[in-house]
Amino acid sequence: MTGRLADRVAFITGAARGQGRAHAVRMAREGADIIAVDIAGKLPSCVRYDSATPEDLAETVRLVEATGRRIISAVTDVRDFDGLRDVVGDGVAKLGRLDIIVANAGITAPQAWNEITPESFRDVMDINATGTWNTVMAGAQKIIDGGRGGSVILISSAAGMKFQPFMVHYTASKHAITGMARAFAAELGVHSIRVNSVHPGPVNTAMGSADMAGALANFTETSPHLANTLTPFLPIWVAEPEDIADTVCWLASDESRNITAAAIPVDQGSTQY
């Protein structure tokens, strides 16, 4: 621990496992207390991987507490603005302030353009785009009230800079997040709040499960010209959650104090292919 985030509090969504858990543990190791939420329950029917569980969220709590930091956790859906606002309010009352927001929660669903239904399009947009907006709106005023600025990090995707074949809804939602970060940065900068988006490529999480990979492979059999659209420059195709957490922690720290409205890829170069 180097104390880069000492005396700060971070609000993290989708914190039960994967990238969200990695963000929580990494920030705790750097001295931050954590407000952690996750749906920890059933995901929409278009999602091909298992949802997180309350036990997953409890494990995140255990790992954060093992660092010696405090954590407030709650089972909350990012589509529930009032629920998020209540969790943040409770967390600030108990932990004293809010300095960092990490809007990490999101879903993906491999579907060809003509297989996407109005329901699945709405589900992906509601969780990824509206859920991100809800997250920022639930916490931004608390950062302002703290009086010393802060950092908001929106987790987009390589698809939010380029595109992901066979995921029109996911691509649209992640581009929305990219634009949202810039727009929030423009208005929140007067309060010394920085807002940036992070754009991972493939990451070793439940979202990258064998079922997901198999579904995409089936699609590329019928559209082979799209098979290599996200080929990386580096020899590593799949990052670990901790790799993304390194970047997110840096954006939360004073080391990135002059960086805002930036879209930062952590994608092994795949968005440039």
PLM features: residue spans?
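Short C-terminal tail/terminal secondary-structure segment
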Residues: 162, 235-236, 248-249, 260-273
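A conserved structural motif in NAD(P)-dependent oxidoreductases
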Residues: 232-244
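Short, small/polar-rich loop/turn modules that mediate ligand/substrate recognition or access, typified
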Residues: 189, 194, 259-261
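Substrate-binding pocket helix/loop in short-chain dehydrogenase/reductase
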Residues: 112-113, 117-122, 229
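Canonical Rossmann dinucleotide-binding motif of NAD(H)/NADP(H)-dependent dehydrogenases/reductases
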Residues: 3-41
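Active-site helix of classical SDR
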Residues: 136, 173, 181
